[in-house]
């Protein structure tokens, strides 16, 4: 057909076929005869005008071209189809490439010329309610497409409709027969129909094939003749939830595919299978529960019990190189207890201590190691958590569950049986950083924390993988199977391999106070001036007014430790503190406001004139103070004025402590500024030939060096001896002790820095410190504790 004729045909293509159009043009030519002024285009226009003015009989409506049977359907046609319904699949869900969810169902219809699959899409699913198997229907406005294997399919469109016809008008259509096959007679054959009762529903399981993950779920079904398994795959898995299928339901399954597996014929759901729940004549199912006390080596048993212990999963490598996982739990009923072993996907079931669990299809084996029977699950095992009803046993287990509540911390603190396992719920009150340690089988990790509830708090040691678990102060946690450990001062807990740290259950949170409420309940806020020896459970709000660098030391057991000295002050006074290990590494700066909780208040008398000090260790907590905490706390400058009153040098005496003086340095001596001390006894070192301290007798591998710079300081009122030690000596010299040691060692001259020290003469300094009487010169001497200011 020429292009210009095609354009004319486009005007009436919905009325006649191209062949009809060409036929009409030829007829019109014969009618007009030899009329030279009319070409083909003019004749075609005349034909089109005639068609548009009157109703024409289309070629497709002529008997010889009409698509009125299934065998005559042609691909691409939009036409009604008529047939008897032979199969209706259950609707299945799918997800489009754009992420939208849709549904489809397959309906097989047949007439006396063949069968046709009709595909009902999301908009058409509601039409399935209008008919059932055996009905004769006409589906209007369907699109005929090529399907799998070259077979044609009818795809419904949004405007498609379904009309149920009188079957007596179509006696030639094949008859619908619904033959039910007893489960005991199943063979590996074509599709079958069964009526059965569901005796078990598995969890949804996953598998991997060709790099893609799939899903499946299995239903155990039975009738009077036998039992088998019915499996649904991938998107069809959703049918179980959509239809609300559960154990005990009766169902009719139409057009399932029998398959042989392990010498047993099972059923598989296909794209044409339909599941119809209903009231059917099949035997009732009652599964026999085996009491735990009656267990022996047996297969395919069902037990129910209360979960009394849950262990974390453990991964392992199979012989084929793949990774598996195993997890054990312990259950109990009114006759005894048993360990249950879960494998792979079952290890990911969220099972909590206190859950009631029913396990069906498990095997019982004798465990030689524990000399007891163990329940071993397998691929076909069904696990049901907290079943709705299972008779008297369920009530007994629910009563037992009430007795398994976690213990209050105050109750644990009263326990005396070391090694006993307990459960506890609380909030993390303090938390140290993990640290490594060496043991016989390699390196371990340990971390300490304090847990608190409304009754008290307790220290817990976390070991290895428990120490690496992400946690934050204030988090609410449930700790199961922690072991009692009798600590130096009180009962502690140890969280090791069999311990579980999980989120609390909803009922655990009912009475648990917030972190802020716990702080107020457990700690008493005290001013520094009100502290007493052995104070416990106190809180101090103060500022850092002095801070030394952390230093390492060796404990009595040979392990390394870390300690840092600091001084804190509030509006009532100041106090020195020792920060140990993790606390020594806290980021602190002079002037910082801090909140110190649960320090130990100790009495020190090792330097003459006893005083209280704070010991801040693993059971203590030191954190930045909040805005609310800062109410009433003076600024750093205000504290300096309050704590360190200015004194003229002429007014100094032996009782002048924590005073501030300002003056000019004079007579600064740099001849011997390095004191060598024994690291064991801290006495001035006088070595024998064998590098042994003559005072304590210890072998000295590396001495400790103390920098000290003597001189005098004067102001308008007088002058006094002054000696800078350690950190303060480094401050005015602007060198570290290590740098001084290196220079002196390299030069082999103790006075190598004499000129640098003498350059300090004439420098004005403002220092805080104490005055005392020098025993050698019997003259007053000032010992700076802090260099506040240095200027030329």
UniProtKB/Swiss-Prot annotation:
Pfam families: CDC24_OB3, Rep_fac-A_C, tRNA_anti-codon. Residues 81-140, 192-273, 301-365, 422-494 bind DNA. A zinc finger (C4-type) spans 678-696. SUPFAM superfamilies: Nucleic acid-binding proteins. InterPro entries: Cdc24_OB3 (IPR035203), NA-bd_OB-fold (IPR012340), NA-bd_OB_tRNA (IPR004365), Rep_factor-A_C (IPR013955), SOSS-B (IPR051231). One of its GO terms (biological process) is double-strand break repair via homologous recombination. Keywords: DNA damage, DNA repair, DNA replication, DNA-binding, Metal-binding, Repeat, Zinc, Zinc-finger. GO terms for molecular function: DNA binding; zinc ion binding. Inhibits DNA polymerase activity of PolB, which can be overcome by RFC and PNCA. Stimulates 3'-to 5'-exonuclease activity of PolB at 30 degrees Celsius, but has no effect at 50 or 70 degrees Celsius. Bind ssDNA and replication forks; replication forks structures bind both Hel308 and this protein. Has no effect on helicase activity of Hel308; may help target the helicase to DNA substrates that require DNA re-modeling. Probably binds DNA polymerase PolB. Binds helicase Hel308, in presence and absence of DNA. NCBIfam families: PRK12366.1-1 (NF009030). This is Replication factor A. It comes from Methanothermobacter thermautotrophicus (strain ATCC 29096 / DSM 1053 / JCM 10044 / NBRC 100330 / Delta H). The gene is rpa.
């Amino acid at each position: 057909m020429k292009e210009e004729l095609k354009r004319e045909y486009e005007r009436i293509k919905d009325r006649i076929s191209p062949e009809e159009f060409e036929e009409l043009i030829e007829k019109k030519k014969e009618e007009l005869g030899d009329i030279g002024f009319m070409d083909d285009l003019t004749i075609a226009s005349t034909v089109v005008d005639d068609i548009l003015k009157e109703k024409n009989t289309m070629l497709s409506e002529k008997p010889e071209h009409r698509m009125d049977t299934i065998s005559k359907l042609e691909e691409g046609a939009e036409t009604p189809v008529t047939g008897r319904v032979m199969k209706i699949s259950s609707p299945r869900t799918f997800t489009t490439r754009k992420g939208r969810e849709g549904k489809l169902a397959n309906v097989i219809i047949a007439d006396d010329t063949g069968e046709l699959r009709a595909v009902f899409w999301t908009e058409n699913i509601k039409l399935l309610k209008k008919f059932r198997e055996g009905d004769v229907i006409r589906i209007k406005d369907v699109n005929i497409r090529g399907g799998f294997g070259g077979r044609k399919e009818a795809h419904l469109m949004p405007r498609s409709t379904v009309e149920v016809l009188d079957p007596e008008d179509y006696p030639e259509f094949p008859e619908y027969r619904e033959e039910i096959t007893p489960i005991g007679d199943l063979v590996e054959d074509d599709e079958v129909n069964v009526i059965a009762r569901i005796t078990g529903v598995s969890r949804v399981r996953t598998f991997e094939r060709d790099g893609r993950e799939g899903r499946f779920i299995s239903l155990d079904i039975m009738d009077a003749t036998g039992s088998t398994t019915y499996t649904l795959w991938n998107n069809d898995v959703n049918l179980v939830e959509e239809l609300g299928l559960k154990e005990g339901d009766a169902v009719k399954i139409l057009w399932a595919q029998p398959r042989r597996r392990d010498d047993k014929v099972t059923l598989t759901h296909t794209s044409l299978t339909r599941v119809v729940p209903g009231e059917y004549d099949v035997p009732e199912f009652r599964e026999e529960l085996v009491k735990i006390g009656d267990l022996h080596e047996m297969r395919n048993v069902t037990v129910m019990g209360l979960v009394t212990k849950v262990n974390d999963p453990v991964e392992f490598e199979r012989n084929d190189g793949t990774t598996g996982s195993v997890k054990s739990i312990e259950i109990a009923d009114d006759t005894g207890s048993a360990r249950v072993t879960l494998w792979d996907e079952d290890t990911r079931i969220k099972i909590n201590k206190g859950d009631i669990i029913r396990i069906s299809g498990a095997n019982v084996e004798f465990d030689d190691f524990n000399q007891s029977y163990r329940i071993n699950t397998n691929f076909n095992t069904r696990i049901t958590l907290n079943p709705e009803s299972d008779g008297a046993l369920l009530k007994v287990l629910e009563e037992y569950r009430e007795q398994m509540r976690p213990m209050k911390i105050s109750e644990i603190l009263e326990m005396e049986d070391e090694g006993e396992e307990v459960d506890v719920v609380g909030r993390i009150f303090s938390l140290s950083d993990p640290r490594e340690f060496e043991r016989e089988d390699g390196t371990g990790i340990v971390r300490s924390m304090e847990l608190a509830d409304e009754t008290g708090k307790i220290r817990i040691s976390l070991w290895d993988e428990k120490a690496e678990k992400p946690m934050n102060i204030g988090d609410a946690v449930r700790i199961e199977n922690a072991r009692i450990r009798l600590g130096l001062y009180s009962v502690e807990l140890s969280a090791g391999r069999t311990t579980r740290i999980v989120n609390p259950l909803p009922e655990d949170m009912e009475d648990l106070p917030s972190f802020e409420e716990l702080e107020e309940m457990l700690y008493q806020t005290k001013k520094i001036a009100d502290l007493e020896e052995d104070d416990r459970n106190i809180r101090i709000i103060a500022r850092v007014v002095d801070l030394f660098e952390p230093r390492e030391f060796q404990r009595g057991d040979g392990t390394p430790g870390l300690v840092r000295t600091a001084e804190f002050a509030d509006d009532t006074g100041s106090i020195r503190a020792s920060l140990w290990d993790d606390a020594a590494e806290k980021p602190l700066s002079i002037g910082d406001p801090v909140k110190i909780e649960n320090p130990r208040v100790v009495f020190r008398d090792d330097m003459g004139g006893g005083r209280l000090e704070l010991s801040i260790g693993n059971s203590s907590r030191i954190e930045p103070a909040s805005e609310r905490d800062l109410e009433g706390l003076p600024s750093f400058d205000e504290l300096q004025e309050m704590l360190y009153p200015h004194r003229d040098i002429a007014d100094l005496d032996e009782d002048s402590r924590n005073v501030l003086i300002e003056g000019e340095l004079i007579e600064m001596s740099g001849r011997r500024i390095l004191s060598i001390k024994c690291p064991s006894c801290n006495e001035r070192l006088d070595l024998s030939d064998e590098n042994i301290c003559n005072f304590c007798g210890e072998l000295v591998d590396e001495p400790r060096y103390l920098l000290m710079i003597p001189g005098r300081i004067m102001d308008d009122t007088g002058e006094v001896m002054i000696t800078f030690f350690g950190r303060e000596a480094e401050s005015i010299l602007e060198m570290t002790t290590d740098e001084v040691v290196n220079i002196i060692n390299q030069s082999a001259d103790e006075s190598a820095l004499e000129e640098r020290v003498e350059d300090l003469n004439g420098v004005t300094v403002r220092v805080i410190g104490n005055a005392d009487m020098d025993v050698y010169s019997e003259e007053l001497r000032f010992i700076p504790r802090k260099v506040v200011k240095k200027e030329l």
